[in-house]
Amino acid sequence: MKNFTRSETKKERVKMDKKKGIFYTIVSATAFGLTPLLCASANKLGATPETLVFLRNLFVIPVLFIVCKAQKIDLKMGGTDLKHAFIVGVFGMTATALLLYNAYLYLPVGTVTTLHFLYPVFVALIGLVVFKEKISKVKGFVLLIATCGIFFFLESMEGSNALLGIVLSVLSGGTYAFYMSGIEIFKLNKINSYKLTLYLAIFSAIVMLGYSLVTGKLSLSQMVPMAYVYAFIIGIGTSFLAVYTLQLGIKYLGASTAAIFCMFEPVTAVVGELIVFGTPLTPMKIMGCIVILGSVTLLTVLDKKAEAKEAKVALEAQAEAGKA
């Protein structure tokens, strides 16, 4: 009877964790999806992409610090974790934001966000190149179809600026794949989410300040007051709300499952762009969205099935070892 009760309790806990993970991931995706609209508005008010990335992290640091202190979270971090957090924060989170914010200058935000969602392709490539993971024929075909989805967005795009926007958008998928993989590979998901987000924001703010000063792209004096308001909202919405809830989503669901529910981000961006800016949705763009997002969803499902199969094989091997 006790074992039955424990089993039921464990099932309920797993079910509750799954619901939490889904909720947190959808909140994160929605917040990320609305961010491009604010970025586009801030750009029109004098903010450069570099300045926005710097400010969004700067503004959220005191908020996160207060939250950590209020919850009595130990802010000490070991040297190895610090190094890994710096690598993931700069080359993952910061690079992704910088590439995306620059891409918004050349392409509609909905297009940029959808192209950015090719990142599962890069996750698979990281597994192939770095970890020598095998890619099945079916998975390889899905990856190819997802990549082909890019061509649907070449409709009516003339000049090098549009092509640059596409390149930046796709590259942002690569850096984001590194961020998602790095959180798990370096076991940073075991660190308190508020604490980790605080360190990521600090590293990002420092690096972006230096980068902006060196490149001369810090536009603080050219920005009107409303641009600062947008930057603050972006900071709270992304570096605090979206990043924090995404980490919780990964914690409760795992990166592969969380990726499915992250699909709410491009949907939010496309619908938001249509409502706010009145950007038309052509049949080619709709088809491109369907091809990329459909392929990514299928890719994620294939990954989940592969993980389940590996877990089953491991359990069977363990059972056989126990008999011996």
Predicted regions and their residues:
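Membrane-interface helix-cap regions at the ends of transmembrane helices
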Residues: 34, 41, 45, 60-78, ...
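Hydrophobic transmembrane alpha-helices of multi-pass small-molecule transport proteins
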Residues: 126, 135-155, 208, 263, ...
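Helix-helix packing/entry segments at the starts of transmembrane helices
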Residues: 29, 55, 97, 112-118, ...
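Hydrophobic alpha-helical transmembrane segments of multi-pass integral membrane proteins
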Residues: 19-24, 50-67, 87, 142-145, ...
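Transmembrane alpha-helical core positions of polytopic small-molecule transporters
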Residues: 32-33, 88-97, 120, 154, ...
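Specific transmembrane alpha-helical segments of multi-pass solute transporters/efflux pumps
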Residues: 31-36, 65-110, 116, 152, ...
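Specific alpha-helical transmembrane segments that line the substrate/conduction pathway
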Residues: 51-61, 100-134, 139, 172, ...
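Glycine-/small-residue-enriched transmembrane alpha-helix faces in small-molecule transporters
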Residues: 2-55, 159-185, 206, 313-324
